[in-house]
């Protein structure tokens, strides 16, 4: 009973933190420049992660023969993707942005099939194709309503999501023995310093202009959405199957959609909503480990 309660709480926490991330970014960016937000977010999170490393006696550095991958994580999992997210988020609706990141499980599945020869079931392939089709239609409609900057924003978000997926997959396959604290602590610190230096050069942030609500949103992004959300998700992955953990990607865009309408009164058209539902259903089909042969065998045995 206690185990089920913990799993349910973890599921709720991760769904809420991920579903509110783009909303919190928008609130924080009301008075804080975007590069500065990201720098503060990573830097604040890194302090707590480094403290946890010392408290739990977890190494900050990767093993000597794997240190280069720690730098790769810093660049391609933190700095570059979040730079692209900042750019894309300026020109793409937050609901559409969350939908783009919702397809990450199927991108990971597809890349696993391509690079690591992981088995891809027939229905997973069908779900993958359908998800790509529905996402393409959704993005085409979003671009149709926008302009050239919207196209660039969509491309930036797709590149950010793909970069995340590649590093996540590679680290899972090759570096699964690395602690999640080690994985995040120093890359967060270095990325935070990088963004703050760039922000100071390009944005010239003035602390006096920061509103209390924007500062609170930044702390929320750092600790609740960042540290707490990430640690909860990785802990959840150890408690449940990959399929059960991946259903969060099905839930958090819906939370974002509801909050977008509740906070700002922004709603999407019924056609676009239907497409999102179809896309989410396709994702569910793709991440569900359904084997047609086993299913047919079950039907035959059932008839007997």
Curated annotation (Swiss-Prot):
Stored PANTHER family: INNER MEMBRANE TRANSPORTER (PTHR32322), PROTEIN PAGO (PTHR32322:SF14)
TM region(s), chain numbering: 5-25, 42-62, 68-88, 96-116, 120-140, 150-170, 178-198, 215-235, 245-265, 268-288
Similarity comment text for this entry: Belongs to the EamA transporter family.
GO CC annotation terms, alphabetical: plasma membrane
Domain of life: Bacteria
Entry keywords, A to Z: Cell membrane, Membrane, Repeat, Transmembrane, Transmembrane helix, Transport
DNA-binding found in the keyword field: no
The keyword Transmembrane is annotated on this UniProt entry: yes
Protein name: Uncharacterized transporter in trpA 3'region
Membrane topology field: Multi-pass membrane protein
Native source species: Buchnera aphidicola subsp. Schlechtendalia chinensis
UniProt xrefs under InterPro entries: AA-Vitamin_Transporters, EamA_dom
Location(s) in or outside the cell: Cell membrane
Residues of the EamA domain: 16-140, 162-288
């Amino acid at each position: 009973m206690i185990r089920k309660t913990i799993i349910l709480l973890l599921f709720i926490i991760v769904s809420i933190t991920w579903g509110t991330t783009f909303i919190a970014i928008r609130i924080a960016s009301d008075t804080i420049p975007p590069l500065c937000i990201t720098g503060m977010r990573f830097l604040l999170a890194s302090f707590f992660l480094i403290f946890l490393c010392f408290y739990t006696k977890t190494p900050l550095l990767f093993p000597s023969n794997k240190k280069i991958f720690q730098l790769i994580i810093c660049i391609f999992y933190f700095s570059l993707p979040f730079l692209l997210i900042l750019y894309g988020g300026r020109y793409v609706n937050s609901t559409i942005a969350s939908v783009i990141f919702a397809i990450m499980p199927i991108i990971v599945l597809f890349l696993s099939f391509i690079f690591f020869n992981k088995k891809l079931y027939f229905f997973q392939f069908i779900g993958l194709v359908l998800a790509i089709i529905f996402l393409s239609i959704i993005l085409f409609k979003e671009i149709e309503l926008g302009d050239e900057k919207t196209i660039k924003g969509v491309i930036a978000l797709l590149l950010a999501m793909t970069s995340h997926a590649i590093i996540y997959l590679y680290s899972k396959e090759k570096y699964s023995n690395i602690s999640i604290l080690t994985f995040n602590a120093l890359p967060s610190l270095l990325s935070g310093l990088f963004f703050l230096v760039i922000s100071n050069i390009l944005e010239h942030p003035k602390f006096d202009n920061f509103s209390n609500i924007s500062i609170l949103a930044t702390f929320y992004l750092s600790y609740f959405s960042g540290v707490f959300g990430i640690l909860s998700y990785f802990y959840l992955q150890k408690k449940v199957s990959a399929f059960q953990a991946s259903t969060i990607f099905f839930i958090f865009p819906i939370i974002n959609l509801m909050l977008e309408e509740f906070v700002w009164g922004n709603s999407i058209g019924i056609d676009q909503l239907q497409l999102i539902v179809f896309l989410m259903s396709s994702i569910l089909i793709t991440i569900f480990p359904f084997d047609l042969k086993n299913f047919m065998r079950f039907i035959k045995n059932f008839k007997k």
